[in-house]
C-alpha cells in the first residue's frame, strides 16, 4: 500500500516569518547577507557554483521545501517509475504538487550534474502553483525553455540526460545538503544575480533589518570611492565616515552630494 502519495508535507514552524520580511529580503544583496551572517558565526551560507537559468528571473526569497536524492539503482529507477501520479516511486511529483505558495524547492543532487534534476515542465507547474523558485546543486534539462521561463531556476548547468540515469528521489522535507550548505525545511533562501544565500529561519527578520542598513551604507561608500576618494578612511567605514553618512542622509541622500557633505565637527 502506498503510504506516501497524497501525504501532506507542509511543516508548522515555531518561528513565523511574515510575508513583509520575505519581500524585504528580496532587496538585500547576497554580499550583505553573507557578511551579516558571518558576523553571527555562520561562515558559509552561500550556495557556491549555482547560476540562474534565466538571468532576468534571478531575484527571489522564500521558504525551503527540501528534496533529497540518492544514486539511482537500475532495478528500481526505470522509465516505468514515471507512471501516472501518484505512485511511491515518484516523490518528485509529490514535491511539485505539495509545495506551497512562496516556497522554494531545494534539491540535494549530491553536487552531481550528470543527469538533470528536472526539466522545464516541473518549474512551469511550480510557477502556476505560486512557488518562489527551484534550486538544485545538480543540473537541469530543457535549458532553452528555462532561459525564457519567468521563474527563478538555479543549478550548475544544462544537460540532456534524464534524472533516472543517476538520481532517485529518496525523501522530502528533511535536512539536506545543497552545494555544500546545510538546508533545513523552512530555512529562508534569497537569490539575486550573484547567487543564493541560506538564512536560518529564526534570523530572517534580523537579517532584513541589518542588510537593509548595510546595503544603504555600501551604496553611499561606493559613491565616495567612485568620486575618487581612497579606500583608507572610507571603506571599511570609520566612525567619522558613518557620521558623514548620517549627515548625507539627513541632507536628502542625493548620490552627487555623497563626496561633499560632511558631519559637523
PLM regions and their residue ranges:
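N-terminal low-complexity or amphipathic/hydrophobic leaders
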Residues: 14-90
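Flexible, glycine/charged-enriched surface loops at secondary-structure junctions
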Residues: 44-50, 220-236
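A contiguous pocket-lining binding segment that forms or flanks enzyme active sites
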Residues: 136-137, 143-191
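A hydrophobic, small-residue-rich beta->alpha segment in the mid-to-C-terminal subdomain
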Residues: 188-230
